[in-house]
From Swiss-Prot:
The modification Hypusine is found at K36. Keywords: Cytoplasm, Hypusine, Initiation factor, Protein biosynthesis. Belongs to the eIF-5A family. GO terms for cellular component: cytoplasm. The lineage of its organism: Archaea, Thermoproteota, Thermoprotei, Thermoproteales, Thermoproteaceae. GO terms for biological process: positive regulation of translational elongation; positive regulation of translational termination. This is Translation initiation factor 5A. CDD domains: S1_aIF5A. One of its GO terms (molecular function) is translation elongation factor activity. It comes from the Archaea. It is found in: Cytoplasm. Functions by promoting the formation of the first peptide bond. The keyword Cytoplasm applies.
Amino acid sequence: MSTKYVEAGELKEGSYVVIDGEPCRVVEIEKSKTGKHGSAKARIVAVGVFDGGKRTLSLPVDAQVEVPIIEKFTAQVLSISGDIIQLMDMRDYKTIEVPMSYVEEEAKGRLAPGAEVEVWQILDRFKIVRVK
C-alpha cells in the first residue's frame, strides 16, 4: 500500500486522497476560517475511484491526510472471460486479473484480446483507464 501524507490545505480539485480506506478523486474543496480564535477548516468532497461513491471529509487545513501514490503502466489484454479481464504487465510480464467493474466506461467497448491498455495501480488494486 503506497501512500504519502500531505496537509489538507495543500489538496486541490483533481488530486487524490484516501477516505475510509478508499482512494478518491477530489471534486470540490472549500476552505473557511471559523472565527477569531478558530483554525481554518477544509471541507473536501471526493468521488471513489473504484466504486464511484461520494465521500465528504471535514478537518483542519493543517491536518495530515493520506494521498495514494498512483503507478501507471501499460498492459496487454490476454483474455476476457465473463467479468474478469486477464492482463499481462508489459514491464515484467506478470499476469494480472482485473474485474470488469474496474474498467472505465469509455474503454469497455474497445477491449479485445491483444489490445494494449493503460492501467493504474492504486493501493494494490488495478483499474483499466483507457485502451491505447
